[in-house]
């Protein structure tokens, strides 16, 4: 198929975009080991009737919703997120936006739950406050999904960290979702299955 007329710059942009993502998803033993370690933690926690709490802002919140539903329904691992407008607005009003998530974890978290935090920038204050205080509330381990600066604040609180070497929100968020859904399929043991 030939290139549509007068679209060479768009083709070049898309070629670079796809190649950037292709490099991120190239097989990498370090990432594989972290995914395996994380999945084993998740399974172990599930067997103890503990849950995973996942949170993010904006696109990362949407990813957390998708992951929590698929993980609970398809992999049979309990997972919750805090994307209810009433919870966010109530807790933000009462505790301030920077502390609403920390307080949601305080109220809903249970001893030895796992906490997954997604922040493309790694600098979201509500995510940082949640990470900083989660273990005080009994959270066992924190798994972070970040991008931009390798030494970002959110990553510094993680026991396992998935950092994306990019400064593009969409590239970072797409890769975070790819990693999280890979965890679901890794726990199930296959990527094709009936959705019942």
Q: How would you name each of these model-derived features?
A:
Residues 27-48:
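A short, well-structured juxtamembrane/interface segment
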Residues 18-22, 29, 47, 83, ...:
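A short alpha-helix capping/helix-coil boundary motif
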Residues 43, 53-196:
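Glycine-rich phosphate-binding loops that contact phosphosugars or nucleotide phosphates
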Residues 11, 32-35, 98:
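Short, structured helix-loop boundary elements
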Residues 1-29:
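Generic N-terminal amphipathic, Lys/Arg-enriched alpha-helix
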């Amino acid at each position: 198929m030939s290139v549509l007329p007068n679209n060479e710059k768009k083709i070049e942009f898309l070629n670079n975009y796809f190649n950037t993502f292709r490099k991120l998803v190239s097989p990498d033993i370090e990432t594989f080991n972290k995914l395996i370690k994380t999945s084993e933690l998740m399974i172990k926690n599930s067997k103890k009737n503990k849950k995973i709490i996942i949170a993010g802002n904006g696109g990362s919140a949407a990813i957390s919703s998708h992951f929590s539903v698929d993980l609970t329904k398809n992999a049979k691992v309990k997972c919750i997120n805090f994307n209810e407008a009433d919870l966010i607005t109530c807790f933000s009003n009462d505790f301030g936006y920077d502390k609403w998530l920390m307080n949601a974890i305080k109220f809903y978290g249970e001893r030895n739950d796992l906490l997954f935090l997604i922040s493309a920038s790694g600098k979201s204050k509500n995510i940082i406050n949640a990470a900083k205080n989660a273990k005080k509330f009994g959270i066992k381990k924190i798994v972070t999904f970040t991008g931009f600066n390798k030494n970002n604040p959110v990553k510094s609180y993680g026991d396992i960290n998935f950092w994306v070497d990019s400064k593009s929100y969409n590239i970072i968020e797409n890769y975070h979702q790819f990693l999280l859904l890979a965890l679901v399929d890794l726990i199930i043991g296959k990527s094709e299955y009936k959705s019942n």
